[in-house]
Amino acid sequence: MSSDRMMEYYYSMGQDCLTNGALDDAVTYFRKAANMGADEAAYEICAIGRQMETGDGVEKNEEKAESCYKIGVEYGIEKASLYLGEMYLRGIHGGKPNPRKARRALEDASDMGNREAAALLGKAYDEGLLGKVNPKQAFRYYLLAAERGDTSSMLMIGLFYAQGTSVAKDLTAAEMWIRKGREEGDADGDQTLRVFLSVASSEYITGAAGKVDPAKAWQMAEEAEALGDKDVFYRLGKTYSAASNQKDHLPKAFECYKRAAENGIPAAMAALGLCYEAGLGIEEDIARAVSLYKRS
């Protein structure tokens, strides 16, 4: 029998065993087929490993799943390296995690272009799952994953730029990445953008953004408010009040408190009352101050 016929025979036998639920025998036949050049047989072994790992329609067996993934790795299946890395990171069958093996497997998958592996490496370095927290490596792998289309990593890269963590603070780059992740449908996109805009709006007042831009600050606060942050103008008002040495800051603080008070924020009403009582950014008006204090 020719080698091609033998390969087809082994692959067919593997499929029959798979259909009959004889997974161990299926792996044996698929491996023989893979050894003879049937690439799809190696993928079948990896898929069987996934079934065994998750218990999808079969008895859960992480040890056998690990064995299947190792076979997949031999044939260069990137998902096999990813799944191995995930298993080693959490620990097999209730055992302790193995950071060294996890890193090696995930790096192999990432080197083959797997974005999930790159994202997981970013998370692992970010949270110290591989030992110590390593922000530079976290940023490196989050960026790889983001460039490959991982939306969660896009948000994380944005936050790294926003905070200046292991990379120069750059609110323009931060905003670009966060908006990109949101536009591409990440479930946390709205919340991440809302928080970013809220914090950045104050930084454009204090200069922590790298420059002072009151118009940008107001625009960001308006968008954060539209996304559900009803307190944002109150906090922006406090930022202006804290920097009241600037002649135009008290009137701007007043406008911010007024905007927040219109949203029903009690603390903003009290702050607005103080502005009227002390004539801070507005002409003194004790009657209005008392009214606002009562409402707060």
What spans do the regions from the language model cover?
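Structural signature of tandem alpha-helical TPR/SEL1-like repeats
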Residues: 21-29, 59-68, 95-105, 132-141, ...
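Short helix-capping/linker turns of helical repeat alpha-solenoids
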Residues: 5, 36-40, 45, 54-56, ...
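A generic tandem-repeat structural signature
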Residues: 63-93, 100-108, 120-123, 127
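Core solenoid repeat modules with strong leucine/isoleucine-rich periodicity
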Residues: 155-156, 175-183, 187-203, 219, ...
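N-terminal leader/linker segments that initiate helical-solenoid repeat arrays
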Residues: 1-21
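Hydrophobic face of amphipathic alpha-helices that form TPR/SEL1-like repeat modules
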Residues: 11-17, 44-54, 81-90, 120-127, ...
